[in-house]
């Protein structure tokens, strides 16, 4: 019995069939390739025509002419490769990975459109069997080399190929090498490198195996890679069940750090993947950037769609065949809350244990008037925003001080932004009637914490306290123990900018050089205008009072107050004799000043 011929016949009848035949030598592999090609040529004409037309259609399957390179990345990860190398040469491009080698059963799915050897493999990303057919955007002929197989594909036909001379870095039995001949001008080094600019190290974050991707074109070479560190394990409530989640740190070549959470969940009875097997568990993963300014994305292994949240999320979402978006499938909708569970737990973990100022991880509402499309990434963003307002807002606990105990957000008072440089923690705590003031150590420098809390407050989340307002802080002007003149100056200036002039005119909000607090009433007090002479001919009368030196400082606070006092005719130049006499002639006020 010719075992090899029998195995080929079996695969031609059922490409998913299991064959255990060994192909030990290049000669046997070449014979198998010829038998496969003969079987395809002997097939019914209608089937050959369908395959040929499918290949023609694959040329325009994606709007990205180099989509096939993304497919190579996906296939390499499915093969368990740790490295993928892409090398553009003068007349071809080589794509090589160090994953599992080529088997007889792999040959037909590599070359035939809509034929996949991964449909029954729940863990593999591939499913449609069309990805490598997008090669037709570059060429109609290509080769694969992996001992003992050396195969050339041309349309729907295949034949043995001569082993090529390969660079040392990708030669040897450990490597599977795809060779893609290119006509002159088909792909330049500039075009390849420009395409690759859309990728970065973080593109590899949620792959299962691939850790390094190198692209070389001419004298230019770029490497994407991540260095990984196992951090810990956490028990996280996902989909209503406590699950073990692995926590790792991944660092990019430019030093950016990501905190990655991965777990496995049990599928529901009604979960069904499109054209793909469903395993006994479903992987879920999120990657959170520990630095702000990083864009997010939705992955199905590789990034597929942008996500307007500082997170990369992954599970077994159903993509469309071109992998340029996601299908409108029931499963995709069912997986959104599962991802949100892991995301909420991860963000809380970062804020509580890693970086108390990582507010950039929390989404904010879209600008008014924007209408998000009903795409998967939009539904994910909406779910994460809702989850943040609900569970995260109520469950998050932050330290009350450095080294101090944690407290829920409802126990913290915060001041409105205008008061940030005016009040200290004791003022905020007292005015906000709260156990604690939100400490500086949990406030990010960009102020996103304030926007997040404002959104949560507006959503009625977690009974957050209202901000201490400027009008509340004006009560401190009547507090004899509030003696810090610099802060009193700031509070007065802030109150003016907030439109509370009518309140200030009745308050002792000004401090003289000798420490008295007086009201800004021209009928009661005249204050020396520091812009005039330091002395005047009528100083002996004592009717013009010197303000505290804090009002003469060159800052916005002092300038706001002195400008206001001028408008109210409360400032008098010492060398303006007429004005001083007028002040002296104000009867009861002058007598009070002289006494």
What are these regions (language model features)?
Residues 1-20, 182, 223, 228-233, ...:
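Amphipathic alpha-helical coiled-coil/helical-bundle segments that mediate oligomerization/assembly
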Residues 81, 139-141, 209-213, 220, ...:
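A broad structural signal for short, well-ordered beta-strand segments within beta-sheet-rich domains
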Residues 159-250, 333:
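ATP-binding catalytic core of ATPases
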């Amino acid at each position: 019995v010719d075992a090899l011929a029998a195995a080929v016949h079996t695969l031609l009848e059922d490409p998913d069939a299991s064959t255990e035949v060994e192909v030990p030598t290049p000669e046997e592999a070449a014979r198998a390739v010829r038998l496969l090609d003969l079987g395809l040529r002997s097939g019914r004409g209608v089937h050959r025509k369908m395959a040929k037309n499918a290949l023609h259609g694959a040329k325009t399957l994606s709007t990205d002419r180099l989509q096939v390179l993304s497919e190579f990345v996906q296939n390499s990860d499915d093969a368990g490769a740790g490295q993928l190398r892409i090398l553009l040469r003068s007349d071809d491009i080589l794509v090589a990975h160090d994953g599992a080698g080529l088997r007889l059963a792999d040959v037909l799915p590599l070359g035939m459109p809509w034929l996949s050897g991964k449909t029954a493999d729940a863990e593999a990303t591939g499913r449609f069997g069309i990805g490598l057919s997008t090669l037709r955007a570059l060429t109609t002929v290509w080769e694969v080399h992996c001992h003992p197989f050396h195969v050339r594909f041309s349309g729907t036909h295949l034949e043995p190929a001569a082993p090529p001379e390969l660079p040392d870095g990708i030669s040897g039995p450990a490597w599977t090498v795809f060779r893609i001949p290119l006509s002159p001008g088909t792909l330049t080094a500039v075009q390849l490198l420009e395409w690759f600019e859309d990728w970065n190290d973080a593109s590899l974050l949620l792959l299962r195996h691939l850790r390094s991707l190198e692209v070389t074109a001419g004298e230019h070479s770029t490497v994407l890679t991540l260095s990984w560190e196992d951090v810990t394990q956490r028990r996280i409530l996902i989909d209503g069940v406590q699950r073990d989640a692995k926590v790792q740190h991944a660092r990019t070549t430019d030093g950016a750090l990501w905190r990655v959470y991965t777990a496995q969940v049990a599928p529901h009875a009604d979960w069904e993947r499109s054209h793909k097997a469903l395993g006994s568990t479903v992987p879920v993963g999120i990657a959170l950037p520990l630095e702000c300014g990083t864009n997010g994305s939705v992955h199905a292994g590789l990034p597929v769609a942008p996500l307007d949240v500082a997170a990369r999320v992954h599970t077994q979402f159903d993509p469309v065949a071109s992998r340029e978006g996601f299908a409108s499938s029931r499963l995709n909708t069912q997986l959104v809350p599962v991802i949100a569970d892991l995301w909420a737990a991860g963000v809380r973990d970062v804020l509580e244990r890693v970086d108390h100022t990582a507010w950039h991880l929390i989404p904010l509402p879209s600008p008014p008037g924007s209408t998000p499309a009903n795409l998967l990434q939009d539904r994910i963003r909406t779910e994460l925003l809702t989850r943040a307002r609900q569970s995260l807002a109520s469950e998050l606990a932050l330290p009350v001080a450095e080294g101090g105990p944690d407290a829920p957000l409802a126990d913290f008072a915060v001041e409105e932004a205008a008061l940030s440089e005016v009040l200290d923690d004791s003022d905020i705590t007292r005015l906000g009637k709260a156990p604690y003031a939100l400490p500086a150590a949990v406030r990010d420098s960009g102020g996103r914490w304030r926007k997040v809390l404002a959104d949560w407050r507006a959503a009625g989340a977690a009974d957050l306290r209202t901000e201490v307002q400027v009008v509340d802080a004006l009560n401190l002007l009547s507090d004899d123990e509030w003696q810090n003149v610099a802060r009193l100056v700031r509070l007065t200036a802030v109150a003016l900018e907030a439109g509370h002039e009518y309140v200030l005119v009745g308050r002792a909000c000004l401090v003289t050089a000798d420490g008295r607090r007086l009201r800004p009433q021209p009928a009661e007090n005249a204050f020396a205008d520091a812009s005039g002479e330091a002395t005047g001919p009528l100083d002996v009368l004592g009717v013009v009072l010197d303000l505290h030196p804090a009002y003469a400082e060159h800052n916005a606070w002092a300038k706001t107050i002195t400008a206001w006092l001028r408008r109210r005719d409360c400032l008098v130049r010492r060398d303006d004799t007429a004005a001083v006499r007028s002040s002296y002639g104000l009867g009861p006020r002058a007598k009070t000043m002289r006494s």
